[in-house]
Amino acid sequence: MTATSSHGARLTIDLGALAANWRRLAAEAAGAECAAVIKADAYGCGIAQVAPALWDAGCRTFFVAHLSEAERTRAVLSDATIYVLNGFPPGSAPAYRAMGFRPVLGSRSEIAEWAQACRSLGERLPAALHVDTGMNRLGLNPAEAIDLAGDAVLGAFQPTLLMSHLVSAEVPGDAITARQIAEFARVRMAYPALPASLANSAGIFLGKAARHEIVRPGYALYGGNPTPERENPMRPVVRLEAAILQLREVAAGETAGYNARWTAPGPRLLATLSLGYADGYPRAGSGRAEALVGGVRCPFVGTISMDLVILDVTQAPPEAVRRGAPVVLIGDGLTLDEVGQRAGTIGYEILTNLGSRYDRHYIEGSSLSA
């Protein structure tokens, strides 16, 4: 961090590590195409920067959630294949056609609407078929999907992919995962010529039965651990730092933060940092989160507020405790997954909520440590 930081907190995103993670996942899934999920503004890391970095690494197929995200991706990647996971809004088929987007269709009514739109446009436009194998969220049920295989409606457009989504691929030996793999294989028999996709980040590490022709990593690309029961095979991509705004000595019995929820058990040195829940750092981490000051873990005290947090830096090295000194909130061993766990959530939520107020710094070569 620099003293000229306009916010007082910096988010560093390592595009070199991102590309290395994609190559690592592509190698793990050798024989399948490795796509990339870049929904939610590339998991908070920025579509405009992330998508070209992945393209340069060799990725050619991208998945987003909404049409607006597809448009932002197309603005930086003119030749990429772009699937829209949440299907298509009524009346948007001309936009999909003009921009070359492929909706993921998950119901008979949506399929009928897409087919009718293709007839009206006079063109068999591409689309994916989504089968629900256990999530009960989006998708055709397996019986519907098998029945659909013989329906003339498929002749009105060009099916290019059969896909489903794993419920708990990160849980070793999970029975639901085994059932989903088997169910998807059964449905796929009705579509022998259609490329298929089932594996997410964790699914890539389940072996060939889950991979099929296309794998769809998301969280792991950005440094999240796809194998939480084992050491993380991915390189860290994000680093969050904030500068110390103010130092304050408090005596035993004094309180800090809203509602006086923390009381000093003895003399303490407190540091206030310029970030809070408005920046995506979860309020639920109050009293549970930690940050690194001079390499020493220091606890958050009091309630995390909108723009400020307070640390107990009593045990930090004296030379690291000064106004303007950097504090690490993600990085150097404080992982996304740990930050999420301490806040009672998951690393995905931490990553995608990292706010727009940070000074963002993109680097091409990996200099971040786990």
Swiss-Prot record:
BP GO annotations: D-alanine biosynthetic process
List of residues that carry N6-(pyridoxal phosphate)lysine: 39
EC number: 5.1.1.1
Binding site for substrate: 137, 306
Enzyme class: isomerase
Matches recorded under SUPFAM superfamilies: Alanine racemase C-terminal domain-like (SSF50621), PLP-binding barrel (SSF51419)
InterPro entries according to UniProt: Ala_racemase (IPR000821), Ala_racemase/Decarboxylase_C (IPR009006), Ala_racemase_C (IPR011079), Ala_racemase_N (IPR001608), Ala_racemase_pyridoxalP-BS (IPR020622), PLP-binding_barrel (IPR029066)
Keyword annotations of the record: Isomerase, Pyridoxal phosphate
Pathway: Amino-acid biosynthesis; D-alanine biosynthesis; D-alanine from L-alanine: step 1/1
Any GO MF annotation of the entry: alanine racemase activity
Catalytic activity reported: L-alanine = D-alanine
GO cellular component: cytosol
Cysteine disulfide partners in this protein: none
Database matches in Gene3D superfamilies: Alanine racemase, Lyase, Ornithine Decarboxylase, Chain A, domain 1
Keyword Isomerase: yes
Catalytic residue list: 39, 258
Essential cofactor(s): pyridoxal 5'-phosphate
Chain's role: Catalyzes the interconversion of L-alanine and D-alanine. May also act on other amino acids.
HAMAP family tied to this protein: Ala_racemase
Protein family membership: Belongs to the alanine racemase family.
Protein name in UniProt: Alanine racemase
Origin organism lineage: Bacteria, Pseudomonadati, Pseudomonadota, Alphaproteobacteria, Hyphomicrobiales
